[in-house]
A protein has these predicted regions:
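Beta-propeller domains with acidic blade repeats across secreted/periplasmic ectodomains
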Residues: 35-283
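Bacterial Sec-dependent N-terminal signal peptides
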Residues: 4-35
Length: 283
């Protein structure tokens, strides 16, 4: 019987062709991903004058496309045409206490200093803030590790702030509300939301508006992680429970309820309803 003409006998080139096809299938998704990634994320190198030391703590764009930059040294700089070859730098604010976060809303910048959320407004439109308004403040013990982060705006205009624990050889909360996530309104009302935080430097919303925060490895935190936070949650480090018995605390878990012993977090969560295990662990 004659072989159909459309059937081609396999030869030694089949293995080469198979390997080529496999390689092509591996490359195509990578190429497509690279193309789509570039649509959303692009690295811009901004030239900085030698006379300015930024040590960036926060970034926020104005409605006009200017870039606000808060610095660890206590300043906020405003960059006009930030992606051009020669952006114009103007010192918008100074004299702040280590502002680690910046947001822009309704014509004003908001930043979180070590001890307060501050609203910075340029009333006379000269490019420099002439009003520094304290929205809400909290106590400090003076410990070097009491960093404060934010704010992050909610759709209704309320702000979220996270407060680092102090460090005395281990994480501690010597003053309210260290180790907590706080919600603060524009008129200065504060609501404690969640605790168990150690060094919560980064947080944001997912596509559904749910809040997640990134945690830094350390005591009670075996490895870096991302955790979904809701009101009344306990994220694992017990130091912030020093303030769980305050009248406005959303949870009543006590520090003594968390044994200082070997154990796995998800096992503790079976018996402690407010404990929130991480969504993602980082190696």
């Amino acid at each position: 019987m004659a072989k159909p003409k459309h059937l081609i006998p396999l030869s030694g080139n089949y293995t080469v062709m198979k390997n080529f096809v496999i390689l092509l299938l591996l490359i195509i998704p990578t190429w497509l991903f690279a193309q789509s990634e570039d649509e959303y994320y692009r690295i811009e190198t901004i030239p900085i004058p030698d006379s300015i030391v930024l040590e960036v703590g926060g970034l926020a764009f104005t409605d006009e496309g200017k870039l606000g930059v808060s610095t660890r040294r206590g300043e906020v700089w405003l960059l006009d045409r930030p992606t051009s070859a020669r952006p114009v730098f103007t010192r918008f604010a100074h004299g702040l206490h280590e502002p680690l976060g910046l947001a822009y809303r309704n014509g004003s910048f908001y930043t979180t200093q070590r001890a307060e959320v501050t609203k910075l407004t340029d009333n006379d439109n000269d490019g420099v803030a002439d009003r520094y308004r304290s929205i809400y403040s909290w106590p400090l013990s003076g410990n070097y590790h009491e960093y404060s982060y934010g704010p992050l705006f909610l759709p209704n205009g309320d702000m979220l702030v996270t407060l680092n624990l102090a460090w005395i050889g281990y994480g501690e909360s010597p003053v309210k509300w260290r180790g907590w996530l706080l919600k603060i309104s524009e008129d200065g009302n504060m609501t404690p939301i969640a605790t168990g935080l150690r060094s919560p430097a980064g947080y944001g919303f997912d596509i559904d508006g749910e809040l997640f925060y990134g945690e830094n490895q350390g005591d009670w935190i075996g490895s870096g992680r991302i955790t979904h936070l809701e009101k009344g949650d306990f994220a694992g480090n017990p130091a912030g429970l020093n303030w769980s018995q305050e009248p406005d605390s959303p949870l009543r878990l006590k520090r003594t309820n968390i044994p200082d012993s070997v154990g796995l977090m998800h096992e503790f969560a079976k018996n402690i309803s407010s404990m929130k295990p991480p969504t993602v662990w980082f190696p």
